[in-house]
Every structure is written in C-alpha cells, then in structure tokens.
C-alpha cells in the first residue's frame, strides 16, 4: 500500500486538484498494478488521504478536501503549507510574471463575489517598476497555466479564485481582503459562493449550517429564524 500512497501523492502534485471521479480513475490502475484493494468509498479515500498527510505534514505539504460551490464539486487539493502569493508562481518565471500572479489574485479577491470577466484578467493590471511590460499573449499563457494548477477557475466567461488558492492562500486572502472573504463561523474555514442567512447575510458552508440546523432553527450569528432554503435550486 505504501507504493500506492506514493504514486497517488505524485498524481495529486501533478493535477493540483482532483474530483472524486478523477481520484477513482487514478487509484483503479494504481491499485491494480500493485495488487492492492482499491478504496471502495469516499470514507475509505478520506482515510487514505489522512494516512498520506501523516507522512507529508512535516514536509510542508498537505492534501485537503474542499467543497467548491462554483462547480458544485468537492475537490482534493494538493497544497504547500508555507505558500504566499509571491512564492506560489515563482518557479521559472520572471519578476514581472510573478507580480502578475499577485496582482491578478488581488484583483479577483477585491471583487464582492470574487470573480472577474475574462478580459479583465489582462486589463488595468499595472506591474510596478516594470521595464518589460508583459504581452497579452504571455498573460494568457500564464493564466491558463495557473488555471490548470487550480489557483484560478474559468467558468463561462468569468475567472474565479480556484480551489488551490482557497486552500493554500486562505490566510493571505482572509487577512488582506477581509471585506469580501471571511471564514465560516461554524468551521472556521474560508467560505465563498455559498449559503447566506436571509436576515444578517452572513455566509456559511452549506454542509456546516445544515448540520447546525438539525439541532436548532436560528442563525448562529444573528439569532433570527433561519429562512434560507438549504437545498440548492435547480436550473
């Protein structure tokens, strides 16, 4: 099983973020090659991930499950625990290209709903003290690379903060963009694009408030009766 764990960790690094469907596609041949029983449920996969985390936490790495409302998906994210906007994109890039990542991250995070139009990813982003302005074609290449790495997410014609940014850069985002990005008061983890109280507009993870409301029927923040439907609307 140790060989399976190592192979799966490599796959997590390569993909950056994985759906349960992709996890199954990776584990099926991996376990078959090593003649090991494949985890047969989400609970078994979570247990496998917990075992891997025990071996990599001291190395500044972490595998984290995160629910991502924009895509109505739960992803497993590979993250570095010491990451900052200045460090996540610096491998093989120029200073201007690294600065573009930081500026783009801040531009998206400063929006009320933390997403921008596709064209805005190239417009009105000023790189300080840059003697070599980035060409739009290079910006497009970098954005596609960072989308593949999970730092940003493309949905229709909008660019959102990606699942990896929400995990790896959560402290930076909640500290520097506190007006738009806050933690769920129930689990203390960052929450975006999720369910809000109809009275006070405080936002929670859908799963967190659903569990909370099994024992009481009021908002944990304002104390008023909870009226927002928990189930997602269809269409």
Curated annotation (Swiss-Prot):
Residues found modified as Phosphothreonine: 185
Protein location: Nucleus
GO biological process: DNA damage response; DNA repair; double-strand break repair via homologous recombination; protein ubiquitination
Entry's Gene Ontology cellular component terms: nucleus; Smc5-Smc6 complex
Keywords: DNA damage, DNA recombination, DNA repair, Metal-binding, Nucleus, Phosphoprotein, Transferase, Ubl conjugation pathway, Zinc, Zinc-finger
Coiled coil: none
EC annotation from Swiss-Prot or TrEMBL: 2.3.2.27
Chief location category: nucleus
SUPFAM superfamilies xrefs: RING/U-box
Catalysis performed (reactions): S-ubiquitinyl-[E2 ubiquitin-conjugating enzyme]-L-cysteine + [acceptor protein]-L-lysine = [E2 ubiquitin-conjugating enzyme]-L-cysteine + N(6)-ubiquitinyl-[acceptor protein]-L-lysine
Zinc finger extent (RING-type): 181-225
One GO molecular-function entry: zinc ion binding
Family to which this protein belongs: Belongs to the NSE1 family.
Quaternary structure and interacting proteins, as annotated: Component of the Smc5-Smc6 complex which consists at least of Smc5, Smc6, Nse1, Nse2, Nse4 and MAGE. Nse1, Nse4 and MAGE probably form a subcomplex that bridges the head domains of the Smc5-Smc6 heterodimer. Interacts with MAGE and Nse4.
Described purpose of this protein according to its UniProt entry: Component of the SMC5-SMC6 complex, a complex involved in repair of DNA double-strand breaks by homologous recombination. The complex may promote sister chromatid homologous recombination by recruiting the SMC1-SMC3 cohesin complex to double-strand breaks.
Protein name per UniProt: Non-structural maintenance of chromosomes element 1 homolog
Top-level taxonomy: Eukaryota, Metazoa, Ecdysozoa, Arthropoda, Hexapoda
């Amino acid at each position: 099983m140790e060989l399976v764990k190592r192979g799966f960790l490599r796959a997590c690094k390569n993909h950056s973020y994985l759906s349960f469907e992709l996890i199954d596609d990776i584990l099926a041949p991996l376990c078959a090659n090593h003649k090991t029983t494949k985890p047969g449920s989400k609970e078994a996969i979570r247990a496998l991930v917990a075992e891997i985390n025990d071996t990599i936490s001291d190395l500044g790495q972490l595998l984290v499950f995160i629910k991502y409302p924009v895509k109505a998906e739960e992803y497993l994210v590979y993250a570095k625990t010491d990451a900052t906007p200045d460090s996540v994109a610096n491998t093989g890039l120029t200073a201007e290209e690294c600065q573009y990542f930081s500026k783009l991250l801040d531009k998206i995070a400063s929006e009320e709903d933390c997403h921008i139009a596709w064209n805005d990813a190239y417009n009105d982003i000023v790189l300080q003290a840059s003697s070599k302005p980035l060409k739009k074609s290079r910006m497009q290449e970098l954005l596609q690379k960072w989308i593949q790495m999970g730092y940003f997410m493309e949905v229709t014609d909008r660019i959102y903060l990606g699942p990896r940014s929400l995990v790896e850069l959560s402290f930076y985002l909640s500290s520097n963009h506190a007006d738009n990005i806050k933690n769920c008061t129930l689990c203390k983890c960052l929450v975006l694009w999720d369910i809000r109280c109809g009275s006070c507009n405080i936002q929670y993870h859908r799963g967190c408030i659903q569990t909370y409301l099994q024992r009481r029927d009021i908002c944990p923040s304002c104390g008023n009766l909870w009226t927002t439907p928990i189930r997602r609307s269809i269409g």
